[in-house]
Curated annotation (Swiss-Prot):
SMART domains: PGAM. One of its GO terms (molecular function) is phosphoglycerate mutase activity. Pathway: Carbohydrate degradation; glycolysis; pyruvate from D-glyceraldehyde 3-phosphate: step 3/5. The active site is at H12 (tele-phosphohistidine intermediate), E90 (proton donor/acceptor). Substrate binds at residues 11-18, 24-25, 63, 90-93, 101, 117-118, 185-186. Catalyzes the interconversion of 2-phosphoglycerate and 3-phosphoglycerate. It comes from the Bacteria. Belongs to the phosphoglycerate mutase family. BPG-dependent PGAM subfamily. Keywords: Gluconeogenesis, Glycolysis, Isomerase. It holds the Pfam family His_Phos_1. This is 2,3-bisphosphoglycerate-dependent phosphoglycerate mutase. It catalyses: (2R)-2-phosphoglycerate = (2R)-3-phosphoglycerate. The gene is gpmA.
Length: 249
């Protein structure tokens, strides 16, 4: 089958809470200065590579939307259609949202910390609706009702992301459009797991860096015809190592 479908995945740039080493999840924080620079560089990489996004899919969280806007502006594609969906939101980190990662690691130990952070099917404790970090009263999720998560594991993220991939994103790919998905570490890990057929155990080792475009060439069944490639491999390696080290002082 022909490699006629180009898919670009872009994790949002470094956020204020990434900078402070806090669990973020669905808390709506903005990009740091570093994150803005990463997003602009991502757009420059797209332009330099000749990849021209025809449509953008992103989440309802500001850091992803900001990243997309800066990247598209740098690539002179700010005018393309945009589809936003909660299904591309970051994994909901439950009661961990707002906590310092290093302090959480010290309090609960490395085994529990990694279980909450990287296990496929073990979610953190749920977030109470009266927490200052709750989304229970957030108007952007008013239509979710019982679907509004209070915590998630990666398995849950896949369950809410895949229907959107299958109903919306693949439709654009089938139409011959180059698709840019600007989202989050775990929603993109969920999609990469699906695309690359990564096992439930091995997905724990996958770390996606902030602000570096990852390019897939897909066949007509939306299977990769070759391994996905970062447009800046060196920056991606440094960024992935930084993600892996989160929790350390």
């Amino acid at each position: 089958m022909s490699a006629s479908h180009a898919l670009i995945l872009l994790r949002h740039g470094n956020s204020e809470w990434n900078r402070q080493n806090l669990f973020t999840g669905w808390v709506d924080v903005r990009l740091s200065e570093q994150g803005v620079a990463e997003a602009k560089r991502a757009g420059e990489l797209l332009a330099e590579s000749g990849l021209v996004p025809d449509i953008l899919y992103t989440s309802l969280l500001t850091r992803a939307i900001q990243t997309a806007n800066h990247a598209l502006d740098a690539a002179d594609r700010l005018w393309i259609p945009v589809v936003r969906s909660w299904r591309l939101n970051e994994r909901h980190y439950g009661a961990l949202q707002g906590l310092d990662k290093a302090e959480t690691l010290e309090k609960y130990g490395p085994e529990q910390f990694q279980l909450w952070r990287r296990s496929f099917d073990v979610p953190p404790p749920p977030l109470a609706d009266d927490s200052e970090w709750s989304q229970a009263d957030d108007p952007r999720y008013a239509d979710l009702g019982a679907d509004l998560p209070r915590t998630e594991c990666l398995k849950d993220v896949i369950a809410r992301m895949l229907p959107f991939w299958e109903s919306d994103i693949t439709t654009s790919l089938s139409a011959g459009k180059t698709v840019l998905v600007t989202a989050h570490g775990n929603s993109l890990r969920a999609l990469v797991k699906h695309l690359d057929g990564i096992s439930d155990d091995d997905i724990a080792e996958l770390n996606i860096p902030t602000g570096v475009p990852l390019v897939y060439k897909l066949d007509d069944s939306f299977k990769p015809v070759e391994p996905a490639a970062y447009l800046d491999p060196e920056a991606a390696a440094v960024g992935a190592a930084a993600v892996a080290a989160q929790g350390k002082k």
